[in-house]
């Protein structure tokens, strides 16, 4: 039998509950021209009371099944113009509908569907799955507070076969890695940024700008590329250029795993393999991260 006595020796740091991976396909029909948004949404609520944890009293709990249904209904009545706006709609609903909800955290991930196109003509209702970067967002709002909005890109896998090297690093008794002036550079981009505010922000267009900037700084000019002396330098260059192009972004976090491709030794077969046949290695892999933010002076 559950105890009804509160333990005075411990205190809550944070609580939350909700529903994860609520999937929705929303279809906007404008005559024969259809537009779609498929999303997976996770919602976490924090309540003012902790009586459900301490005493097993469920009288304040909004069931997670209700949370799931709410996501479905908001998609119907509000639509999904962008995943960021949809997440803000969810936050606003729970904070305005339930006085004992003090915090709402919403994560939304968009399935990368792209409209079919041929010879410049777009199909009116057919789409193809194009995994060239997944658009996600996180929105958190507290009672009497403004929403804090993060957007991001993940699962954007890119590779270039040259214009990358790694030299001049520390060498000790455990170092076996040779310096290299020319190598393959492959990574799977994770990029997340925070907006200063939500007013007059075109979230879809901003996401496209950031993604294009990532590809631009990774690849360089189409006819010759751009040399990368390290993953760190490429990461930083992406951040600096992005913040210069999008003034609404306050800070940006990037994670770039260094996905390795090694030359296969064919000497025992009497063959010389000049970086033509390489072995992809899933792990271990290097992982480079960095977060930058605008200096206060740059916002004045």
From Swiss-Prot:
InterPro entries xref list: Uricase (IPR002042), Uricase_CS (IPR019842)
Which keywords belong to this entry?
Answer: Acetylation, Oxidoreductase, Peroxisome, Phosphoprotein, Purine metabolism
Q: Which residues carry this modification: Phosphotyrosine?
A: 285
Q: Which residues carry this modification: Phosphoserine?
A: 35, 59, 228
Any idea which residues are catalytic in this one? 19, 64, 260
Q: Name one GO molecular function term.
A: urate oxidase activity
Q: Name one GO cellular component term.
A: peroxisome
Q: Which residues carry this modification: N6-acetyllysine?
A: 6, 19, 23, 32, 114, 118, 160, 171, 181, 217, 224, 274
Which residues, renumbered to this chain, carry the PTM N6-succinyllysine? 6, 19, 217, 224
- BP GO annotations: purine nucleobase catabolic process; urate catabolic process
Q: Which residues bind urate?
A: 64-65, 166, 183, 231-232, 258
Q: What is its main location?
A: other
**Pathway per the UniProt entry:** Purine metabolism; urate degradation; (S)-allantoin from urate: step 1/3
- Name the EC number(s): 1.7.3.3
> Which domain of life, per UniProt?
Eukaryota
Q: Where is this motif: Microbody targeting signal?
A: 298-300
Q: At what positions is N-acetylalanine found?
A: 2
Q: Where in the cell is it found?
A: Peroxisome
* Record function comment: Catalyzes the oxidation of uric acid to 5-hydroxyisourate, which is further processed to form (S)-allantoin.
* Similarity section: Belongs to the uricase family.
Q: What is this protein called?
A: Uricase
Q: What lineage does UniProt assign to this protein's organism?
A: Eukaryota, Metazoa, Chordata, Craniata, Vertebrata
């Amino acid at each position: 039998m559950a105890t009804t006595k509160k333990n005075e020796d411990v205190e809550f740091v944070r609580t939350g509950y909700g529903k994860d991976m609520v999937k929705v396909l929303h279809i906007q029909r404008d005559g024969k021209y259809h537009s779609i948004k498929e999303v997976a949404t996770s919602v976490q609520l924090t309540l003012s009371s902790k009586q459900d944890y301490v005493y097993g009293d469920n009288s304040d709990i909004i069931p997670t099944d209700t949370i799931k249904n709410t996501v479905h209904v908001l998609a119907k009545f509000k639509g999904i113009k962008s995943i960021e706006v949809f997440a803000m709609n969810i936050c606003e609903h729970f904070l305005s509908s339930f006085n004992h909800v003090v915090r709402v955290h919403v994560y939304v991930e968009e399935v990368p569907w792209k409209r079919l196109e041929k010879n410049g003509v777009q199909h009116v209702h057919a789409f193809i799955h194009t995994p060239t970067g997944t658009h996600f967002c996180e929105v958190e709002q507290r009672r009497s507070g403004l929403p804090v909005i993060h957007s991001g890109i993940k699962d954007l896998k890119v590779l270039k076969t040259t214009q990358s090297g790694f030299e001049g690093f520390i060498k000790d008794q455990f170092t076996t890695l040779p310096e290299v002036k020319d190598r393959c550079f492959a990574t799977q981009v994770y990029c997340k940024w925070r907006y200063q505010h939500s007013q007059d922000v075109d979230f879809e267009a901003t996401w496209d700008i950031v993604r294009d900037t990532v590809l631009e700084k990774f690849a360089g000019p189409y006819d010759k590329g751009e040399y990368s002396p390290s993953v760190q330098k490429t990461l930083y260059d992406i951040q600096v250029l992005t913040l210069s192009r999008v003034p609404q972004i306050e800070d940006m976090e990037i994670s770039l795993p260094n996905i390795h491709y090694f030359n296969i030794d064919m000497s025992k077969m009497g063959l010389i393999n000049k970086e033509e046949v390489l072995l992809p290695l899933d792990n271990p892999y290097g992982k480079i991260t960095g977060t930058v933010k605008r200096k206060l002076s740059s916002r004045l």
